[in-house]
Amino acid sequence: MAAGLLARSESARGLFATASEILGFDLAALCLNGPDTELNLTSNSQPALFVHSAAALADFYEQRPEVSDQVVAVAGLSLGEYSALFAAGALSFERGVALVAARGRAMQSAASAVSSQMASVIGVDREQVQSFCDQARQPGEILQLANLLCPGNIAISGHTESIRVCENLVSEAGYKFIRLAVAGAFHTDIMRPAVDELQRALEDAQLIDARVPLVANVDAQLHDRASEFAGLLPRQIVSPVLWEASLRKLLDMGVEQFYEIGTGRVLTGTLKRTDRKAPCEAFGD
């Protein structure tokens, strides 16, 4: 992870060095050499992804400086929302690293307290996925929609037994069910214990108003005020991510070009499923 960026970009190396000082460990070494068991811990992967995105953005603007003045809105999926706030000028890099590290620790702790999982249900609309969840949910357990990514791709989160029952229902109905390699049931009330810690961390984050608006995960609406972000971010970890609706919001605004900055191709893939004509360029490793 980040090998290409670190090899070619002095700016990227500088950001990773700064982040390592804040975190108290060599983040670049962890990204390059692992072990994956350490890198994949939510408490480590969240700052790693944030720093990677910031480094990719710096590298992107070095190559394409003209784009900086053309940006009309930003969005990011789950943790990516913090990278989007950084890109919009609402969150400094240093405070962003500390904030996502606190978020990662809080979510890791909440996930470790309960046996829970996430999974993707493929080829099914929202109403049918909700019906599967309602049928599979075990007494006293949580099972709910977590990420509404794009048509035919919805992630669910919940207690492990409810996930198991849902997998049987979905498979029996002839649809694809994919368990996700994540620490726990993100974007559900299982993460409720993490909210207080995140709110405390936000008090030190010194968010400011954004240069361009953010399309927020929780409501797919435009927001540009620091006071709004401080309320949206805690809600996000216990609420479904309305990603498809966020993409449609940007399309309805008349956005003519999308740029995906950072590792992975989530935007590229989900945008293609939402509107095949929408152009998207990806920049990362």
Task: Locate the predicted segments by residue.
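FabD-like malonyl-/acyl-CoA
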Residues: 1-130, 180, 257-284
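NAD(P)-dependent dehydrogenase/reductase Rossmann-like domain
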Residues: 162-163, 201-202, 277-285
